[in-house]
């Protein structure tokens, strides 16, 4: 496995899916945030001009990933913000606290590919491997 975190789109009928890979649990959540905003727009078009604190809790690691991505998507939809930088400050199997950086949507610079309606549990998994962590997530679009 590559020692750097990365994501790869997967084929999924009518929805958008990603496989996520990272050497650590914290980096898995950072790369998941990048995958979410990759589905929405071009990541390279987002500048880290504003900062937001994000904290979520859940009963297990799969639910934590869904809660994390759902919270990011909530701010995208309600505050019209896009994020490109994800600093995971604290993470456990049931909680994550992070500072995310990005900017307000600028229609002159951001081409919106799709709107994420929901982060789903469909085909979701999060697991530790001998090379680090991997996950799969499907977004309802």
Where in this protein do the model-derived segments appear?
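N-terminal intrinsically disordered, cationic/polar leader segments
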Residues: 1-141
